[in-house]
Amino acid sequence: MIEIWKSQCTRILSISPDSGIQYWKKTESMKSQYLEEVGVALDSFVYWKEVIWKTKQEFRAEYSFPKTSLAANKVIDDDDINIDSLKFVKEVINVFVGNINVLVKINDPRSWFFVPGLKEQIEQVLKEFKLLRFFVCFVSNKCIEPQYRCSTFYSHVLIEASHIAMVVCLHLPIYGNGNQDLAPSEKMIDIWKSHCPDSFPYMKVISKTNVIIKTLYVDELRSCPSCNSYDSFDNWKEVIWKTKQEFRAEYSFPKTSLAVNKVDDVNTHSPKFVMEVIDVFVGNLNVLVEINDPSSWLFVPGHMKEQIEQVLKELKLLRFFVCFVSSKCIEPQYRCTTFYTLVLIEASHNAMVVWLHLPVYGNGNQDLAPSEVSRLFSDFMEMKIKSIEPGISRNSIYIDVLQALKSTIPQAQKKQLDIPTHSLTVGFSGQMANLQEMLCLLRDNLIHLPILDLEFHLQDMDSVIVDAGLLIYSLYDIKGEKEDTVLDDMNQALGFDLPRNIEPIKAMVYLVMQKAFHCNLPRIHGLGYVDFLLKNLNDFQGRYSDSLAFLKNQLQVIQTEFESLQPFLKVVAEEPHNKLKTLNEDCATQIIRKAYEVEYVVDACINKETPHWCLKCWLLDIIEENTCIKAKIQEKNTVEDTMKSVIARTSSQLARTPRMNEEIVGFEDDLLLALLRDAIGEGSVRRELHANELSDMLRKTLLPRRYLILVDDVWENSVWDDLRGCFPDANNRSRIFGPSHPMLGPPKSKLPTHQMLSTGREVGEQVANNLGTHIHNDSRAIVDQSYHVLPCHLKSCFLYFGAFLEDRVIDISRLIRLWISEAFIKSSEGRSLEDIAEGYLENLIGRNLVMVTQRAISDGKVKACRLHDVLLDFCKERAAEENFLLWIKRDQTTKAVYSHKQHAHLAFTEMDNLVEWSASCSLVGSVLFKSYDPYFACRPLSSHAFAVSHILLNFKFLKVLDLEHQIVIDFIPTELPYLRYFSALIDQNSIPSSKSNLWNLETLILKRRSAATYKTLLLPSTVWDMVKLIYLYIPNFSPENKKALFKNSPKLDDLETLSNPYFARVEDYLSETVDHLKHLEVLELYRVEFGDHGEWKVSSGKFPKLKILKLDYVSLMKWIVADDAFPNLEQLVSLGCQNLMEIPSCFTDILSLKYIEVDICNKSVVKSAKYIQETQVEYNQNTNFKLVIIKKLVLKFDRFHGDEEIRKRLSSLPGIKSISINRGEKKLTVGGDVDADEVRLVVGKLNKRDML
């Protein structure tokens, strides 16, 4: 055996030679030496006990199982592996099995091989050896891969088997000459110490008890050396009883909550050790249950024996569940370490309770009363596995166990159904299917449940997971070796009442689903979300009436409730900042969160992803919570009415008290007083002066001086308007600052700090030296205060700017379309969403939170804007904090996916990030792709377009998908029913037609690559099925199926913007299709061919709501318009229409017309435009009418340094439409309604500063 061991172990194991070989060698040497000295025959082993005992004692000190972990050598040479390796492993295990069998069969106490107290454990080891051998045979016979792939596995099997054999050998009890080997209790303590954390208080109890018992035993032997010590226990009762009384006072189970130490060693709490410990406890309890002799000091009365039997049954089930988890968990076992530790703690608690409260009768001393013991056992039964301390993550444990449970249910179900004699209920199959569905839901939702939210439900979660595991395990025999009696015990304990056992699991599934959904909701919402929900509810109930039939009544109630709450949301959207603002915002937030929930429930019902019982329960809870919200709003309204009445009475009293009114006037003028006192000295100004007198005094004081004034804590534009007249403009480079604002400049300037300071270098340097650090440190607090006073409806709009890149100009029309699609805009009767959104934007501009970079020449509306870097950083940070917006950049790894909650909106900078994160973004509402690389869209199509169509399926609630200018696509997504905004880049000439489910899409923007701009794009007929389409912008497109366009054009009643269609015979399509779009507001025709004659006839009453008409390089010659066509037209733009004879004279009668722009047109068009202007202004008194004739100014330059500064300076001039710089020809071309002198003045200043 030693020779075989040497030949194999040096090749397979890392031990050369192993301590086992050393042990056998030294034993043989000692045997030979002893025989030579005493001359005793080989079969005279009487004196060998002393030798062997000493030898084992020596090796026990060196051999530290199970702390020693031997590593198997990596086998490099495949030829070095032969079939003898597997054969050798089986031979070694067979030798061990044979030796252990000898130990088990010896029952003579006189034999030195007799094992008195460890036989049950050795039998268990024997069983494990046999199973290990069978498994090795199974692997060798069934593995398809070459055997050398399993060499490492064989090596580990060999190591473990050798370890077990060495432990049995080293700790084999040997009696003789007064030398006793390690007692079972001491062995257990050693193993316990090596495995368990030092913080367990019951370790002290066990150690101290063992010392007391050992001392008693030695004293007994000394006092009575000739008597049988095993029968001399009468005097021990009193000592043991007192000892337990002492420990009971210190041990407070179940009140003690033990913290689980962090385990660094994966082998520390192995399932094998846990099961061994439970086996010891089960064995001890079995002894108590089997003793029926009342005279025995271990006798337990019947009323307590029943409880011990119940605890015994629970321990057996717990042991089986540990075995189940260790066998079935797919993830590595170290992920379940905390679970095993918990089981170990609870099993140890149970054993300690039994020992401490074991009734001891004798000498008049009676242990704890039966009623108290009953209570202790009841506490244990209810507690089962107790929660660990907060902060320890166990998502992974739950998910692993649930995965194992879910995969085992079909096997358990098949196993039980194959047994015809089993007492199952009729609905067993259905109940098991329900259980599997619930566990699947529980696992999927746990993945997205943050740790902090999970900790609130740890105890309930533990109970549910364990109950589910025991229930399923009782139906499935893992190893096929459990005795029928054990299985019957478990089935009897569970009662096979599946509905009753499933109920707590149902409750937990519902709780976790709700919690997982709630934790991913944003804390900032758009007030228009309820509007979209109400529209969708009607559409969903019409489209999916069969799927939603069982929820019809609940949905109708919810719809009515939300409609009744609409007036309140409208008030919140229009109210200014006031004392009740917080209460209103809280109620509005709760309402919108309920709207999110309803949308989720309806979608889950349609897609059959959640059980009906769960969805119905959820809707009933929503109805109840909406009722509570309405009651809170009613209470708030009552308080508000009371406050208004008090204010009204106070105002009337103040009106009757002139003296008090004077004091209030003086109080309101504190700002002017402070400015005057700083300017002319303290105490020189009287408070009794009125505002106009103070203003005049301040103006006169400042007029002859050069001043720098800093005004803090001013938040209203009206205050700046009142102060403006106090600051004379003497052209002496004086400055006014408002440090509390992010925009520090003169009133109404709206300039950021760096732009204002650039106009005065001396002032800028002084401010930078004296105030720079202070402003930098306080910038976050300043912006935070500005954000805090924002009304509820503006917060989401402002934070949304965080989705844009730094130093980028933001197109207003695009921004407003995004706001509307995100449901940030609350509808109001009589106003369009676009008008309301523009009002929101002007409000933000008025608060100096947004900078205007370009205004329209026609009506002065904002066309482009941007944010200061400080404000942009704030938006990104605050949006992430509010679970509103998350930027996912290039350096974020996949590992971070599950560390974040699902945010409402995601901004990506790399296509790879989108692919990696898509699997965890099922609840995300918006995806906006941004790229710092301006050439990103010019990359080959295959580099980033291939994955888009696949990953979009994961974003089931997607409402905004903005890939504009970044991602090239060759398709239109069709399975996103909630999508309202879609923009992308395309370079195909056609888009494949497929069935579309985009019935909510409102904005469709498809832009072309520069190389493909002039190619005609064929749109599939499914585009015309998008019945809610409002904004359609696709350069140079043509319908693929003309008949489909004619047929479906009446469905597009909501279409308001149609940009750049291409028609081969435009007179047919415009008359038969486009002019039927009754709600069309914007029509842009780009390079349209108007047939051979170039004629376009617009009949009476057509385009009733059209506001903007743009003709861009069309081949139009003769334009005939009926008198009552275009009744609401506001803007007409003619660009590059060089063949057009004139603008029809009927435009002089359109009273709504405000603006005409003519660019690159012939003189007759310019003449007709001037005639329309003259008529509109003089005869129609339309003073707001404006005519812009685009002119071009070309300037030569000799030197050129930076075009960004030039564009920036010239763009600030009014009327500038285009700026072109030609380096080769040294030309600067400026187009628009420009003032040539102003342009030359700016260019001259730049020349002086060496910019040109």
UniProtKB/Swiss-Prot annotation:
Subcellular location(s) of the protein: Cytoplasm; Membrane
Pfam families linked: NB-ARC, NB-LRR, WH_DRP
Gene Ontology molecular-function annotations: ADP binding; ATP binding; metal ion binding
One of the record's GO cellular component terms: membrane
Gene3D superfamilies, sorted: P-loop containing nucleotide triphosphate hydrolases, Ribonuclease Inhibitor, Winged helix-like DNA-binding domain superfamily/Winged helix DNA-binding domain
NB-ARC domain boundaries: 684-736, 786-830
Main location: cytoplasm
Protein topology in the membrane: Peripheral membrane protein
Additional facts recorded: This protein is encoded by the haplotype B genome of the allohexaploid Solanum demissum.
Similarity section: Belongs to the disease resistance NB-LRR family.
Name this polypeptide is given: Putative late blight resistance protein homolog R1B-11
Organism per entry: Solanum demissum
